[in-house]
Amino acid sequence: MGLILDSSVLVTAERQGQNARQMLTSVAQRVSETEIAISVVTLIELAHGAARANTSERKAKRQKFIEELQTAMPIHPVTVPVALRAGKIDGENRARGVQVALPDLLIGVTALELGYSVGTSNLRDFQRVPGLTVVRL
């Protein structure tokens, strides 16, 4: 089984001064999953954060972290089955008055489609994705 990391885990690691490989080693020591990966949506969130950095030093540090991630672990795309399943879950959730942020929903459904769990420090949204196993990191 595998684990898709949410951006919350990556942002925390980057802020603590870890590079991508150190973060991956740290996570691997805490979980038993055979593959640790991210969704392309997480890459979008990280790129957004780098673009919004308030100093050129912070921007460069974040961009370096993003570059390292691209060679440190698999990055899974949003596929047509992921998009359709996410749309179905979003519609059903909203009909019940439950809302999940679209990036988190796409990350969660990517994990579901792969038979993986999601590793995050943001349990709230991911616990609203039916059938998803969420691991607190």
Regions found by a protein language model. Give the residues of each.
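Residues that scaffold the ATP/ADP-binding catalytic core of kinase and kinase-like folds
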Residues: 12-14, 23, 49, 86, ...
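Acidic, PIN/NYN-like endoribonuclease modules and their adjacent C-terminal/linker elements
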Residues: 1-2, 108-137
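Active-site phosphate/pyrophosphate-handling residues
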Residues: 8, 47, 64, 105-106, ...
